[in-house]
Design a protein with these regions (language model features):
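Aromatic/hydrophobic pocket-lining residues that form π-stacking "cages" and hydrophobic walls in ligand
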Residues: 72, 102, 135, 192-194
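Extended hydrophobic secondary-structure segments that form protein cores and membrane-embedded regions
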Residues: 85-87, 117-120
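EAL-family c-di-GMP phosphodiesterase catalytic domain
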Residues: 1-29, 37-44, 119-126, 144-145, ...
Length: 245
């Protein structure tokens, strides 16, 4: 179910789906999974996804995205109570027809879009405001949750966050990792959570991999955390064992 082979200029790429658990800081319970693509070439060499997406043709990127979304829908059909975060590639952002096709897949699989969170990146700030606002509004109209990743890597505006009304803000790994050794990082993180991110928005800290950093996040019992300290991404088989289905 979770392996796809793509032909690109007579060369083969194998793509598999993995699932990164997102934990509640209080209780350390899993409340969401993030689906990830893992790409290998014909020599079984692993290729970094972000670098691969920079050089792959749009058709190939869409094929990988389609495969991941299909995997998410199949998973949600098998297990009630799970929600999954799905990262939309930058190359497909603002493509209304593609967004409509994702919504159609939910209908074909009888899966509620409300169980899927579409994650967009910081490149959103480089897109004309009218286009990005219309795209995100349409995604919300379809019922999808919305998430912004890598937050905190540039000057942020509370007003823009309120305008786009993200359900979840993911604080960048580069900001979170090492806060115990960097008072400046820690101060920035506190400012973003306490003053910039709108109240009621879910906050997830990426890259929590040190106990010293985790201890400083303990004041925020409501936030979510990701990182190898808790779990590496899971294969579909490992996820089935963990969730018992």
């Amino acid at each position: 179910m979770n392996i796809k082979t793509l032909e690109i200029a007579d060369k083969k790429l194998s793509v598999t789906a993995e699932f990164k658990p997102v934990m509640h800081l209080s209780g350390k319970t899993i409340f969401r999974y993030e689906v990830l693509a893992k790409i290998y070439n014909a020599s079984d060499r692993w290729l970094p996804v972000e670098q691969s997406f920079d050089i792959l043709a749009r058709e190939t990127i869409q094929a990988i995205s389609d495969f991941l979304f299909e995997t998410v829908c199949e998973l949600l059909k098998m297990k009630e109570g799970i929600t999954v975060s799905f990262k939309l590639p930058a190359q497909l952002m603002n493509d209304m027809a593609y967004l409509a096709s994702l919504y159609q897949q939910c209908g074909d699989h009888h899966v509620a879009p409300q169980r899927i969170e579409i994650e967009v990146g910081e490149w959103l700030t480089d897109t004309p405001q009218m286009h990005r606002q219309a795209f995100l509004q349409q995604a919300r109209t379809y019922g999808f949750m919305l998430s912004l990743e890598d937050f905190g890597t540039r000057k942020e505006s509370a007003d823009s966050l309120r305008m786009f009304r993200f359900d979840t803000i993911k604080l960048a790994r580069t900001l979170v990792c090492g806060i115990a050794a960097s008072p400046a990082k820690l101060s920035t993180l506190h400012n973003l959570i306490d003053k910039v991110i709108p109240a009621g928005t879910h906050v997830i800290c990426e890259g929590v991999e040190r106990s010293s950093d985790l201890a400083l996040l303990s004041r925020y019992s409501h936030i979510g955390i990701e990182g190898y300290m808790f779990s590496r991404p899971l294969t579909f088989s490992q996820l089935r064992l963990l969730e018992d289905f």
